[in-house]
Every structure is written in structure tokens, then in C-alpha cells.
Curated annotation (Swiss-Prot):
Its cofactor is FAD. This is L-aspartate N-monooxygenase (nitrosuccinate-forming). It comes from Streptomyces davaonensis (strain DSM 101723 / JCM 4913 / KCC S-0913 / 768). It is an enzyme of class 1 (oxidoreductase). One of its GO terms (molecular function) is monooxygenase activity. InterPro entries: FAD/NAD-bd_sf (IPR036188), HpyO/CreE_NAD-binding (IPR038732), L-asp_N-monooxygenase_NS-form (IPR052189). Its EC number is 1.14.13.248. Keywords: Monooxygenase, NADP, Oxidoreductase. Belongs to the nitrosuccinic acid synthase family.
Length: 650
């Protein structure tokens, strides 16, 4: 073994950083067993879980993916360059834990959850954190003899080239400075694998927050609910939550069951029993209704919709267009996505009606019919699918569009019916239920859509207007929602008078008396509150980042925002960190790739699409293929440095 140790630094040790570390260990075992390699892991929180999945968070916070569809390990489906070294999914780990096959002592709460956990159960985030910490420990314990892993419980604040390259003509090695003053030197490669990061507010947001402070009101900015101090919210106090997505459900849980309330069933109906410590919650958003519930999983851990139209051949044709000739999402991609979703809906509807024998012939006929033409209507008529059962994207995205509300009571009555219907649809499953089977196609097609839109696959105007501002929020609303249990709980809280949904197109202002909100579509909906919670995560924004490392890299020209060419030859600048295609080398302000720096994950959103999605087993997870590519490149930098030094010494 070489006596000089070569080093890689991984900054950010949540699931993505963990995956890179695991892939580095696997690659070193196969390709460099005689080369001493040190892996520095930099994260102020325990590696594996990181901050978001830390084990100390409230047990009232749930994941929105079932246990059988969560992993951090490679499997036979993953198209790897490096070696395959499989490991258990979260559900398989829970089973092994109960069987006594997982070493270590775990709290009773963890063991109790493992006993209750099925493959289609939504685990707590803390439970996932225990799995991730175990996965890190397993990776370190099983690392080849040539690899040592060192955790630095601190935050990286600077990344620089070393002043002198050790070998002539070789790029300088790297130096990382930590918040506690420690300096990591002579690094052959650095991987940025951070997650959601704090961001400065926009000018409009800061003006609003300043007004709130001036009048002495409590304004809680966008944040992970697990990181938010809620002691300032008093029992019985009116509190306004702006946002009805996943963060809203987290706050809803923390302020109700998290304060001692409970749910029970009375004649089959869920009822909330208050503790008396809850605030009075008012909530709203532009769309005005909570995210759609996930359909109960009937696909097992690995099942997914196989593309009918977004096939590899079609994707290859779309990928051939780049830059100013990039694809147009609305013209080239959306019709294919919509057609796939609608086809699955109608096919499942026929099967649910007992006409499964006609489903295949329907699919062939419907796929041949051009979208939005009378040919589609003819097919639907031929298969006796009436108007009331026909797919309507507008009605799905704005389910209240045909309603008129005379009062908040009218809106609440309609909303409760809507929520109960959503729960019933979710209970029917993501294979058997026509609606949820169709909406699950949006989730299953994420990898295919990424292949088209990533790295400037769309022209800039389409990326901004069609993908960022239209499809991404629609996709989140329809397919990245909470478990059905959360929707049922929201309905019970509304009936208990603890939660009030204000209505669509939420308007909020602030004055000396407090925060005021109303829906222009719901007469009499104006409410006032003393506390406003922004129920969303901070923006993914490089230009306004408060992460000290990215801030310094940006200010010094060592990184840049991703840009996309428009049809008229100009650029649209996004808020994502600019990187090359795989292996995602960091680009500087002059758009030059750095041969020793790599970045992937949430901060690169807009280069990549939906970067927050987790690793799923059995479906060739893009996160695993990405981390494998980075690990191969980082190991390549190590071996190149080793060979160069050996040549110099000779």
C-alpha cells in the first residue's frame, strides 16, 4: 500500500453525501485496494441522517414515502460504473432490527415503530434517521483496509485551491476551512452534497417581515418545521399558516398531536380530541386547497408505470435538441406526460367497471388519437366513458373552479366533501383506483422527465414559464402529497374547530393590529392573527444563500448560477449552482469546470429537476447513478494524483 494518504472531502452528510461515501468505499475496494485513501466527512450533524433526518426530531413528523420504497443502497436495477454492493431498504432494515441482526442498542420507541412498520407504512422521519445513521456506520465499518473515514462535526466555510500544485501541470489540490478553525489540506477531490440551505428573504419578503417586527407581531420565516421554535405560539392564539403543502401538514401535526391532542374513531369517523394547548389555526395558499393525498401503495417496493410514450427512443430525440434549440415543455413534453396519465386513468376505470377485457384495446385506440382532438372523444364515446367520468386537468388543479361560495361556511362544507373524497380515492389505491393510479404516473415518470429537462434540455423561456412556474407546482400538488391519514386528520381538525382553511388566492397584509388574510373567492373570509408562519421551505437560491461556503464561492467567482439559453440567444439565469453534466464538476464564474470539485443535490435545482426526491430501490434511482458517477470521478482524481507523484518520485 502507498504510504502517502490521498484524500477526498464530502461536505454534507445526509442521504446524498452518504451515498457518495458508500460508492467511494465500493470503488476503492475494487479499483484501488493498495492506495491509502482518507475520506473527510464534514457536517455539524450526525452523518447519514444529517440535519433534516436527525433522530432527535418529533415523532409526529412523517415521511411521505412508504418504507418499502426507501433505500440508500445500490441494487441490480441501478446502471452502475462502480461495483454493486447491495443493502437493505428501510423496511428490510426494520425487519432485521427486530430479528436481532442489527447491532447496537435502540430506544423502545424505535423498536415499537419497527414492529408496527409494514412495507406500505409511512415511517417517521426520526426512524429513517436511525436507518441512515446505521447505514453510515455499516459503510465505515465495512470500508476496505485502504480507506479511513473521519467525521468533522463542523461546517465548511471556505474552499480554495492550494497555492502550489504538487506536480507540474497538475491542477492544485484543495483546502477546506471549517467553522471551528480546522483546515483540511491536500485534498484530491471535494464533493458538495448539501441539502436545503438557509436563504436571505427577497426584498418584498424582507419588507413584509420588517413591518411585522415594527408592529411587534411574530413572523416565522420559511424553514424546516422541525427546526422552528413554536413555543411562541400560545394556546388558543390565532395563527396564520401561509402554504398548504407538505410543510403545512408538519406544522398541523406539531401544533395538535404534538401538543397532546389525539385522534379517535367514532362510528368509523375520525374525530379530534383537543388537549386545550392548540392555537386556532387559519391556513391558505394561492391554490387554496391542501395537496392531494398519495394513493395507498399497491405496487410493492419496486413497481412503477412503464412509459408508453416517454420511451428511451423518444427521450433521445428530445435530448438531441439543446441550447437555443432546446425542447419546449408545453409543446414537446407535456402532451406525452398528459397522454400517459389519461391513458392509465381510463384503462384503470374500465377495469374497475369490470371491463378489463377492453382495457388493452382501449389503450391502443386512445394512444393513436391525437391529444385534444375529436378522435379522442370518439374513442371515449366508443368505450362508453361519459362526460362526468372524463379526465379534466383544470378541475384537478383547481377543484373549486365551478363553485360559488356565499360564505366561509359554504367553502368549508365544500372543502370537507372534497377532502373526504380525496381520502376515499387514496384508499382505493395507486393501481386499482383510477384517479390515484393516474396521478402516480406523474411520480413514476420523474426520471424520464429529468432526462429531457436537465442540463438545458428545454430552451430558457420554456424552462422558466412551463417547467418552473407551471408544471413543477402542479406536479407537487397532484403527486407529492401527504399520506391519506394526514388529509383525514385535517378534515377532523376542521370539524373540531381547530383548523380553518381560508380559501383560494390567499391575500395577506399586516398592520398595527396584526396579520390579516382573506380569499377574494370567499365572501366574509377575512381573519386576523397575531402570528404568521410561512409554511414552506426556504427558496433554493444561490444568489441569496446564507450558507457561508456557497456564499464565499459565489462572491469570489469560484461558482456561478446555472444559465439556460433562450430562443432569442439571451440567457435566463436560474438560482441553481452551475455544474457540468456527469460527474457534475463545479463551474466558476467564467463557466470553467473545476477538475477537483463536484456538486449535486438540492443546491443544483434547475440544472437538475426535483432534486429533493429520495432514493428508491429497484427503479434505477438517478441519485444512485449520480453518486456513483461522482465517486468514480473523485477516485479517478485520487489515482491520477497518485500516479503523478509516483512518476515524479521515480
Amino acid at each position: 500500500m502507498t504510504t502517502r494518504q490521498h484524500t477526498v472531502c464530502v461536505i454534507g452528510a445526509g442521504p446524498r453525501g452518504l451515498s457518495v461515501i458508500e460508492r467511494l468505499c465500493a470503488a476503492a475496494r475494487a479499483a484501488a485496494p493498495d492506495t491509502a485513501i482518507g475520506i473527510h466527512v464534514v457536517d455539524p450533524h450526525a452523518p447519514g441522517a444529517g440535519q433534516v433526518w436527525r433522530t432527535s426530531q418529533s415523532a409526529h413528523l412523517l415521511m411521505n414515502t412508504v418504507a418499502g420504497q426507501i433505500s440508500v443502497f445500490t441494487d441490480a436495477s441501478v446502471e452502475l460504473t462502480g461495483p454493486l454492493e447491495p443493502g437493505p431498504s428501510l423496511h428490510a432494515w426494520a425487519e432485521a432490527l427486530l430479528a436481532g441482526d442489527i447491532p447496537g442498542h435502540y430506544p423502545d420507541q424505535v423498536l415499537d415503530e419497527a414492529r408496527a412498520l409494514g412495507p406500505d407504512t409511512y415511517p417517521t422521519r426520526a426512524f429513517y434517521g436511525h436507518y441512515l445513521r446505521w447505514a453510515f456506520d455499516r459503510t465505515v465499518a465495512g470500508a476496505p483496509d485502504c480507506v479511513t473515514v473521519t467525521w468533522h462535526r463542523s461546517r465548511a466555510v471556505a474552499l480554495d485551491d492550494e497555492a502550489v500544485a504538487l506536480a507540474t501541470g497538475h491542477p492544485p489540490r484543495q483546502r477546506v476551512t471549517l467553522e471551528d478553525g480546522e483546515v483540511l489540506e491536500h485534498l484530491d477531490a471535494v464533493v458538495l452534497s448539501q441539502g436545503h440551505l438557509p436563504a436571505r428573504p427577497t426584498a418584498v419578503e424582507e419588507q413584509f417581515a420588517a413591518l411585522a417586527r415594527e408592529h411587534g407581531h411574530t413572523h416565522l420565516p420559511p424553514a424546516n418545521p422541525a427546526d422552528t421554535e413554536l413555543e411562541c405560539v400560545q394556546p388558543g392564539q390565532p395563527v396564520l399558516l401561509r402554504g398548504l403543502g407538505l410543510n403545512f401538514f408538519d406544522y398541523m401535526a406539531l401544533l395538535t398531536t404534538g401538543r397532546g391532542g389525539s385522534f379517535t374513531r367514532v362510528y368509523g369517523r375520525l374525530v379530534y380530541l383537543p388537549s386545550g394547548r392548540e392555537p386556532r389555526m387559519y391556513a391558505g395558499s394561492r391554490r387554496g386547497v391542501p395537496y392531494q393525498a398519495r394513493g395507498e401503495n399497491e405496487k410493492g417496493p419496486h413497481g412503477r408505470h412503464e412509459p408508453l410514450l416517454l420511451t428511451p427512443a423518444r427521450i433521445a430525440r428530445l435530448q438531441a435538441a439543446r441550447g437555443t434549440d432546446g425542447a419546449d415543455f408545453q409543446r414537446d413534453v407535456w402532451p406525452l406526460v398528459a397522454k400517459e396519465v389519461e391513458t392509465v386513468y381510463y384503462r384503470t376505470l374500465l377495469t374497475a367497471r369490470g371491463r378489463g377485457d377492453r382495457a388493452e384495446s382501449f389503450q391502443r385506440a386512445f394512444l393513436r388519437a391525437l391529444p385534444g382532438t375529436s378522435a379522442e372523444e370518439t374513442v371515449l364515446d366508443a368505450y362508453e366513458i361519459g362526460e362526468k367520468d372524463r379526465w379534466d386537468w383544470d378541475r384537478l388543479s383547481r377543484p373549486y373552479q365551478d363553485q360559488e361560495f356565499g360564505s366561509p361556511e359554504d367553502f368549508t362544507a365544500w372543502l370537507l366533501d372534497h377532502l373526504r373524497e380525496d381520502v376515499a380515492e387514496a384508499r382505493s389505491g395507486n393501481v386499482s383506483g383510477p384517479l390515484k393510479a393516474a396521478l402516480d404516473v406523474l411520480r413514476d415518470l420523474r426520471n424520464e422527465i429529468r432526462l429531457v429537462v436537465d442540463h438545458g434540455g428545454l430552451h430558457g423561456d420554456s424552462h422558466r414559464e412551463h417547467l418552473d412556474r407551471w408544471y413543477t407546482p402542479l406536479n407537487a400538488f397532484l403527486s407529492i402529497g401527504p399520506p391519506a391519514s394526514r388529509i383525514e386528520e385535517a378534515a377532523a381538525l376542521i370539524e373540531a374547530g381547530v383548523l380553518h382553511i381560508i380559501g383560494p388566492d390567499l391575500r395577506v397584509d399586516v398592520d398595527r393590529q396584526g396579520f390579516h388574510a382573506h380569499s377574494p373567492l370567499v365572501p366574509g373570509s377575512r381573519i386576523s392573527a397575531e402570528v404568521l408562519i410561512e409554511a414552506r421551505l426556504p427558496d433554493i437560491t444561490l444568489s441569496r444563500t446564507e450558507d457561508p461556503l456557497l456564499r464565499r464561492l459565489l462572491d469570489s467567482g469560484q461558482c456561478a448560477t446555472h444559465r439556460i439559453a433562450t430562443r432569442n440567444g439571451t440567457w435566463i439565469y436560474t438560482e441553481g449552482v452551475a455544474v457540468t453534466p456527469r460527474p457534475f464538476q463545479l463551474l466558476d464564474a467564467a463557466r470553467r469546470p473545476h477538475p477537483r470539485r463536484y456538486a449535486f443535490g438540492v443546491p443544483t435545482e434547475s440544472v437538475h429537476w426535483v432534486t429533493a426526491a429520495g432514493i428508491r430501490p429497484g427503479v434505477n434511482s438517478v441519485t444512485l447513478t449520480d453518486s456513483d458517477a461522482i465517486a468514480q470521478a473523485a477516485l479517478g482524481a485520487v489515482l491520477e494524483q497518485r500516479d503523478s507523484l509516483e512518476r515524479t518520485a521515480a
